[in-house]
């Protein structure tokens, strides 16, 4: 049996100087960052990243806001159970996020910062609890079915269809996470940042979530998560009067400019900034531009108080 390797936290501590917090979720340790005090800003990461991706934004906001950044189960510093003991599905991710926010007893309006899969997970949570949401900050993500006639990149299709080969490639050789280090940044990442992003995915057992996220992409109605995505897609207009900031890297092989156009079609009042010098990891490529924009947006939009009620069927 393959032995699980420990994560060398000290190797990236200089870039990620945050205290670790853990919550029990159905017997598994759910890791999160909880820095600062004030109005809560909850940041939700995607695949194959973890809370490390938001480190610069945490450091910028935590002097005035309470920044809460979980690692999904199977990601970052959270436990990485096998697929028999944990259900690596979209709905479970939303349940976990909901459990964390309930456990922290957050009473103030929440700003959701969402990237990649975080858009689906965060928006699903928001539809369960629209009265708890104050603002949205979106970065190269989606929360709707693919735009009309939009093909899924061949890389993702192959991982989904060629399961034995994909398992070997993703869990055995870590090709998805390693490839993301080069493909998802337009400017290129430093050696230290690459090491930090990939550190939690250092052995077969620790890469299961990377594989499961891709396998759960909702391409057809046969996918277990398709119904939940469709429900979000059909109800996004609930947030039409919520303050929304969209920051977009133009060089994204999945969430390209067509996805940005779809967001703008659905939310014409959103504040939008797109960056020709950035890719999918937009916060890595242009943090010096995005962080001041986010700070200004939060200052200018204190949020709205009257919320409609909508509860998602569990």
Model-derived regions: residue spans:
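Short phosphate-engaging motifs
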Residues: 40, 50, 176, 206, ...
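Flexible "cap/lid" subdomain of the alpha/beta-hydrolase fold that forms the substrate-access gate
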Residues: 1-21, 30, 53, 68, ...
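Catalytic histidine-centered segment of alpha/beta-hydrolase-like enzymes
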Residues: 278-287, 291
């Amino acid at each position: 049996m393959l032995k699980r390797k420990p994560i060398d936290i000290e190797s990236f501590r200089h870039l990620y100087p945050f205290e670790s917090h853990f919550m029990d979720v159905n017997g598994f340790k759910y890791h999160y960052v909880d820095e600062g005090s004030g109005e809560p800003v909850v940041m939700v990461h995607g695949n194959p990243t973890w809370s490390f991706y938001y480190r610069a934004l945490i450091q910028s906001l935590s002097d005035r806001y309470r920044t809460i950044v979980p690692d999904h189960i199977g990601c970052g510093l959270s436990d990485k159970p096998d697929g028999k003991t944990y259900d690596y599905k979209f709905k479970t991710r939303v349940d976990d996020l909901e459990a964390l926010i309930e456990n922290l007893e957050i009473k103030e309006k929440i700003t959701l910062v969402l990237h990649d899969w975080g858009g689906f997970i965060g928006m699903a949570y928001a539809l369960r609890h629209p009265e708890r949401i104050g603002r949205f900050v979106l970065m190269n993500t989606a929360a709707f079915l693919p735009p009309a006639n939009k093909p899924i990149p061949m890389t993702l299709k192959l991982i989904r269809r060629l399961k034995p080969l994909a398992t070997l490639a993703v869990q055995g050789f870590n090709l998805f996470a390693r490839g993301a280090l080069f493909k998802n940044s337009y400017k290129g990442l430093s050696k230290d940042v690459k090491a930090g992003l990939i550190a939690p995915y250092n052995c077969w057992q620790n890469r299961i979530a990377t594989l499961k996220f891709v396998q759960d992409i909702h391409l057809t109605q046969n996918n277990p998560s398709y119904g939940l995505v469709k429900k979000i897609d059909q109800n996004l207009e609930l947030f039409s009067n919520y303050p929304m900031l969209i920051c977009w890297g133009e060089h994204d092989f999945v969430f390209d400019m067509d996805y940005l156009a779809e967001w703008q079609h659905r939310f014409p009042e959103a504040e939008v900034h797109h960056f020709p010098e950035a890719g999918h990891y937009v916060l890595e490529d242009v943090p010096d531009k995005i962080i001041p924009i986010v700070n200004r947006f939060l200052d200018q939009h204190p949020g709205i108080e009257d919320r409609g009620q909508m509860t998602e069927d569990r």
